[in-house]
Amino acid sequence: MTQPIVVAALYKFVTLEDYVALREPLLQAMVDNGIKGTLLIAEEGINGTVSGSREGIDGLMAWLKTDPRMVDIDHKESYCDDQPFYRTKVKLKKEIVTLGVEGVDPNKKVGTYVEPQDWNALISDPEVLLIDTRNDYEVSIGTFEGAIDPKTTSFREFPDYIKANFDPAKHKKVAMFCTGGIRCEKASSYMLSEGFDEVYHLKGGILKYLEEVPQEETKWQGDCFVFDNRVTVRHDLSEGDYDQCHACRTPVSVEDRASEHYVAGISCPHCWDKLPEKTRRSAIDRQKQIELAKARNMPHPIGFNYKQTPSEA
């Protein structure tokens, strides 16, 4: 029986002054262990989602933990039958998750971590303001009961949203969450810098919550968007039924795919009447390349305008 592919989402905010020099040995460790996916490294830490065999993931994690700064690196695992990534990359970045606000550093100031088993009690408190820090297309397919959707299209928009809608003098308790924990951790550092006093964030993110909290006790509704070919996972972390429109990145449901406006790789009901002609032509060309690669049984990066984006985890 074929062993499932292990998908590991990992990150750690830690000062890596030598991050440029780390790139090549880290890339070699990924190659040596047969790992696919992308890792981002910056002076503020490391972030990414990778996949491989059980032995490969264990080998990579063991290599990372030989560095004393990485001994307690956070990672979550799920499984799938097919390789969700096609390439092996290590990228140098200014930020491992891009907020775009100078001086925000979770290594120096961060909110209160909340374990998954304590999350339900916290968000049941009527005085707690619950904010989903993810992008609008992620929120559309699943979120926590009672969560506020900022309707942002990128994490860079989050600071302006907070400034326009919330006041530290009025909103005393704030709880935030994201896919794997990294965005809400950085958001908590930003919120504290803006004067918010009680700031909480879900440790390990939604993925850790789904892993540890039984479905009969859950306050999660829907699927969870993930940044790989699986597109979404269910509460049991199995692959969901969504695909992703390669033109606009929006998750598309079974119902969406039945629409006359859905053309695989080219358009969906969410974008068919909004796509610029140049984008549409590029999507058509990319889809032809994908189909040709499939016919030749060769891997090909997923469609137009889609990027593996571990920085959004």
UniProtKB/Swiss-Prot annotation:
SUPFAM superfamilies: Rhodanese/Cell cycle control phosphatase
Pfam families registered for this protein in UniProt: Rhodanese, UPF0176_N
An example Gene Ontology biological process: tRNA modification
Annotated GO MF terms: oxidoreductase activity, acting on paired donors, with incorporation or reduction of molecular oxygen
Residues the record marks as active site: C178 (cysteine persulfide intermediate)
Reaction catalysed by this enzyme: uridine(34) in tRNA + AH2 + O2 = 5-hydroxyuridine(34) in tRNA + A + H2O
UniProt xrefs under CDD domains: RHOD_YceA
Domain Rhodanese as annotated: residue spans: 124-218
Keyword tRNA processing: yes
Alphabetical list of InterPro entries matching this protein: Rhodanese-like_dom, Rhodanese-like_dom_sf, TrhO, TRHO_N
EC number: 1.14.-.-
Keywords: Oxidoreductase, tRNA processing
Enzyme type, top EC level: oxidoreductase
SMART domains from the UniProt entry: RHOD
NCBIfam families recorded: PRK00142.1-4 (NF001136)
Function noted in UniProt: Catalyzes oxygen-dependent 5-hydroxyuridine (ho5U) modification at position 34 in tRNAs.
Family, similarity comment: Belongs to the TrhO family.
Record's protein name: tRNA uridine(34) hydroxylase
Lineage: Bacteria, Pseudomonadati, Pseudomonadota, Gammaproteobacteria, Pseudomonadales
